[in-house]
Amino acid sequence: MKTQKTHTVEKEVSGPWSLATSREFWEGFAPAALGGHSEPEALSTTYCVEVDWTRAEATVTQHETTATITVTGDGDLDAAADQAARFLALDVDARGWIDVAGRDPVIADAQAQLPGLRPCGFHSPYEAAAWAVLSQRLRIVQAARIRADIIDRHGDRGAFPSPNKLLTLDLDLPGRKGEYLHAVAAAALDGQLDGAALRSMEPTQAVRAVQGVKGLGPFGAELVVLRGANVPDGLPTHERRLAAEITQRYGPGRTLHEVSAAWRPFRTWAAVHLRALRERSGTGAPLK
C-alpha cells in the first residue's frame, strides 16, 4: 500500500456560506447521503480524485468566511482539495447571490430558510453520471440501495469505484444499466466527464456534450453538468418536480424560463433551493 499523505489548504469563501446548512442538505441527499461523523463541526467525505482516480478523504471545517480543507490520500492532493472546493461550491464567488433575493421574493424566502446553503451532493460528474444511469426507471430508494451495495462490494473503503474498476465489473443490474455504467466509466477515462472542463463550457453546450455518452439522456446530462460539475448558472429544464414547485410558489401559468430570468447568474442554486424546500415540506420525492 502506498504511503498516505495529508495536505491542508485554507480557502476564503466569497458570499454566503454555512457548512452546517450544506452538511444538513447533503445528509438528506437521497442519491448519495453523507454518512455520520465523529466531529460535529466538520464535514467529512470519501471520493475518487478526477485527475488520477485515487481515493481521497476530505474533512472541511469553517471559521467565519474561511474554509479549511484537509485531504488525505496517496495521489494528487492539490487536485483533491480543488475538487472538494468544487463539489462543495466553495470556489464560487457568491457575493451576488443576495442580489437574487432582492429581485425575487420567493428566492429571498428560500435563502432565509436555508441560510448559507451551497449546492453539494455529488463528488464529480462521473459519480453523477453513474447515479443518472442507476436511477433510470427505478425508485430513488432502490437506486440508492444499489449504489451503496456497489460501493460496499467494489468501492475503495467508502469511495465509489474508479472508472478503471467499474469497467471490470459484471454487475447484475436491471435492463442495460451495466452496459451504460461501462460507457460512463469509459467516458470518464476519456475526459468527457472532467469537472473543470465542463465548468469552463457554456452550460447548454456542456449538456449537449454529455448527452454523447451512451445511456445519458437530457435529464441525466443536466444532472451531470449542473450537480456533478456544480455549474452555478444552468437551468434544469427536464426536472418535472421543479416545474411543480414553480407552479406552487409562483402561481399557475408561470414558467421556469420566465421566473428564472431573475435568478442569473445563480440559476442552478435557485433551483436547488426550491427543490430542497419541496423535499423539506414533504411534497416532493427525494432530491436527485
Descriptions of predicted regions:
Residues 1-288:
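HhH-family (HhH-GPD) DNA N-glycosylase catalytic core used in base-excision repair
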